[in-house]
Amino acid sequence: VVPSLLEASPLPTIFTVRSAEEGGNFSGDDAHRTAMLHAALTSSKPPKYIDVEYELFVKQPWLIEDLPLGDCGIILSWHDMVGRPSDLFQKAAAMQDIPNISVVKMVWRARSLRDNLDAFKLLQARQQPMIALCMGPFGLMSRVLAPKFGGFATFATIDGHEATADGQPTTTELLSKYNFNSINARTKVYGVIGDTVEHSASPYFHNAAFAAAGTNSVYLPLPIPKGW
């Protein structure tokens, strides 16, 4: 099954066997997961990257050396489905110290807009390519502004399909609503603040106006619950 999936893709792929503990659907053991990674790497059309969870690497530090990588890169990933851990920056440093890693990926559930700022700090202090994103209703900012702070990639769901993580925008929202391909380090950020602003039409109007005027700016919904 794994080789046929890869061979059917017209585009470069990232192959991931995401555990249930980190938001995926894989419930097999580590040996099964390792076998699937091997199957992907030895297919006739191997992926451009494979995703290896940091917790799997901690249990099997020899894993990366044993994989037949060839030209395939490794994304070392970590996900916290509950919230921001207290050792976020220490974990980022530890992951970046591991040799032969192409990209470090860190994703956690945002408790408020404040967690997005930590994602941006991680990107600004990165020692190698990094993905730092926040999940949930407060995490959209980190996904849209990833290129502003030098993020390696962001993730979106195809229109009409289920998102692979809570809070993912659709590709149409990223490209058309937020003009994602125009965002860079010099992009100015504006937004509408309030409770339940997710359905505000303001981002549509303002971002369309920014694009028409050639203004390097983006307008975002910034949800702030009562009590903050």
Task: For every predicted segment, state its role.
Residues R186-W228:
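An N-terminal-biased, well-structured beta-alpha scaffold segment characteristic
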Residues T13, I74, P129-M130, S217-Y219:
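Hydrophobic anchor at the start of a short beta-strand
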Residues E55-K188:
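Catalytic alpha/beta core domains of metabolic enzymes, predominantly
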Residues V52, C134, G194:
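Small/polar loops that bind or transfer phosphate-bearing groups
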Residues L37-A39, L122, N181, N207-A213:
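Short, flexible, solvent-exposed loop/turn segments with mixed acidic/basic and small polar residues
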Residues V1-S86, I101, W108:
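Active-site beta->alpha loop and helix N-cap motifs at the rims of alpha/beta catalytic domains
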